[in-house]
Structure formats: structure tokens, C-alpha cells
UniProtKB/Swiss-Prot annotation:
It catalyses: cytidine(32) in tRNA + S-sulfanyl-L-cysteinyl-[cysteine desulfurase] + AH2 + ATP = 2-thiocytidine(32) in tRNA + L-cysteinyl-[cysteine desulfurase] + A + AMP + diphosphate + H(+). Catalyzes the ATP-dependent 2-thiolation of cytidine in position 32 of tRNA, to form 2-thiocytidine (s(2)C32). The sulfur atoms are provided by the cysteine/cysteine desulfurase (IscS) system. The keyword Iron-sulfur applies. GO terms for biological process: tRNA thio-modification. Binds 1 [4Fe-4S] cluster per subunit. The cluster is chelated by three Cys residues, the fourth Fe has a free coordination site that may bind a sulfur atom transferred from the persulfide of IscS. GO terms for molecular function: 4 iron, 4 sulfur cluster binding; ATP binding; magnesium ion binding; sulfurtransferase activity; tRNA binding. This is tRNA-cytidine(32) 2-sulfurtransferase. One of its GO terms (cellular component) is cytoplasm. The gene is ttcA. It is an enzyme of class 2 (transferase). CDD domains: TtcA-like. Transmembrane segments: none annotated. A motif (PP-loop motif) lies at residues 40-45.
Length: 274
């Protein structure tokens, strides 16, 4: 690729800086780590790999990177694209082959959302493979907008106040998931992917399901952002500034024991009759 324009250079620096800040803030990568980068062939995971390869060069610690793609046997999946790209980069990689596509198509009725089952099958396979190769961290390409969308999806449809944490220990206790792009917005990632000309692989299984709940929430957030620029960032910051005493979860705050503090100074003010 040729010389970057001023704007492209600013964008690249911004993404690298924000990813570096997220990695540092949540202690995502430590000295000696083996980071398994989950590469789907989409803009987010390509950007993730690109940013982490740069971080590997400049970080004051040593860590390994291994790229892993899961071939789910979707019809028309271009098997040659990722190996060719990764060989050119000189990155160690593995292609994990597992026919989850057939499982999903068999179990999910036509027209119904496949994302949930597909995600669970993929996640379980990748967790197992990470354990097999001795990966200490599993890096995913979720960004700030994904996190905010998930927050609203859980609120609207599951009645829970949760999102995607930048760092997570899996339920099995053997895998730590990290999201280095947690501070990066999707618009920047899309622009970066465009000028870097990553060889994007479309998802034939879930990418065409335009009526997904996530897409509805995404459109809602985009509309809010158009009307009030900066709102998405403000919502994301709120996830880092939680005040349990101002919510209603009795497991997080002991409301039942709240009593008047008899030692507190009185607020009464002497009133002078006029």
C-alpha cells in the first residue's frame, strides 16, 4: 500500500491509540501471552489483527499472535482468501473446520434468526481450540458500537443490564476473552477497512438477515447519533460509571439495611421571623 493521506494517517493513529488504551486499561495482554486472534474475514477482525500486529512491534512486553479462522462450511465460502492473506503477512494461522452451518440450518426454521445458535456453536469450538494450542487470551473484534448495541438488546429483550465486557473469563474458567477494539467506533473501523482494502468475506448465513433485533437497535442508535452527535460515546462511558445505589438491584446494593445516620449533621437552618 502507498503513502497514507493525512486523514488516513490520523485514522490509523487514532485506532492504534484507542486499542492501546483499552489493552492497558483492562490489562488485556501480559508478558508471555499467546493471543489467539479470531479472524472471521469481516472488517472488524481484520482491523483487530492489523492493530495487534502493530502493538506487538511497539509494546514493552513480548507476546505471540496466532490467527484462527473457523470454516463453518457455508456454501460458497472462499477457502483460499484468508490463508493467502495471512501467508503474505507472515502470521501464524490455523483454519478450524467444523460444519456448524448444516447444524444451524437443520435446527432453525426458515426465516428465524440463526445468530444465537451459530454464535454458541462457534464460541464452543473456538474455546476448545484455544485450549488445545495453549492460547492464554482469545481476542475478538467487537467494537464500542457492538457493546452499546448489546447493552440495549439485553435491556429491551432480556430485562437485564449487561453488555459485552472488554475482558471476560469464560464460564469454563479456562479461557480469557479480550476485546481490544472496545474504545473504537464502527465508522472508523469501516473507513480503515476501506482504505486498507482488506479481502472481506461476507457471511451468507447471518449477514443477510436484515430483520434482526440487533439491526433495529443499530438503526435506533444511528438515528440518535444523527440527532445528537456524541450520544453513543456518552452511553458507552456510562457503562464505565455505574452507581449501584442509584439503580434497583438488591444483589448489588444493600437497600434493606439503609437507615438514618444518627451521627450525621443536621440540615436544619434557623429561620428568622421577619
Amino acid at each position: 500500500m502507498g503513502t497514507l493521506t493525512v486523514n488516513q494517517n490520523k485514522l490509523q493513529k487514532r485506532l492504534r491509540r484507542l486499542a492501546g488504551e483499552a489493552v492497558a486499561d483492562f490489562n488485556m495482554i501480559e508478558d508471555g501471552d499467546k493471543v489467539m486472534v479470531c479472524l472471521s474475514g469481516g472488517k472488524d477482525s481484520y482491523t483487530l489483527l492489523d492493530v495487534l500486529l502493530h502493538l506487538q512491534k511497539v509494546a514493552p512486553i513480548q507476546f505471540e499472535i496466532v490467527a484462527v479462522n473457523m470454516d463453518q462450511k457455508q456454501p460458497g465460502f472462499p477457502e483460499y482468501v484468508l490463508p493467502a492473506y495471512l501467508k503474505e503477512l507472515g502470521v501464524e494461522y490455523h483454519i478450524v473446520e467444523k460444519d456448524t452451518y448444516s447444524v444451524v440450518k437443520e435446527l432453525i426454521p426458515e426465516g428465524k434468526t440463526t445468530c444465537s445458535l451459530c454464535s454458541r456453536l462457534r464460541r464452543g469450538t473456538l474455546y476448545t481450540f484455544a485450549d488445545e494450542i495453549g492460547a492464554t487470551k482469545m481476542a475478538l473484534g467487537h467494537h464500542r458500537d457492538d457493546i452499546v448495541e448489546t447493552f440495549f438488546l439485553n435491556m429491551f429483550f432480556n430485562g437485564s443490564l449487561k453488555a459485552m465486557p472488554p475482558k471476560l473469563r469464560a464460564d469454563d474458567g479456562r479461557n480469557v476473552v479480550i476485546r481490544p477494539l472496545a474504545y473504537c467506533n464502527e465508522k472508523d473501523i469501516q473507513a480503515y477497512s476501506d482504505f486498507k482494502q482488506f479481502p472481506i468475506i461476507p457471511c451468507n448465513l447471518c449477514g443477510s438477515q436484515e430483520n434482526l433485533q440487533r439491526q433495529v437497535v443499530k438503526e435506533m442508535l444511528l438515528d440518535w447519533e444523527r440527532k445528537t452527535p456524541g450520544r453513543t460515546e456518552s452511553i458507552f462511558r456510562s457503562l464505565q460509571n455505574v452507581i449501584p445505589s442509584q439503580l434497583a438491584d438488591r444483589n448489588l446494593f444493600d437497600f434493606a439495611s439503609l437507615k438514618i445516620d444518627e451521627t450525621a449533621a443536621s440540615r436544619f437552618v434557623n429561620v428568622v421571623n421577619l
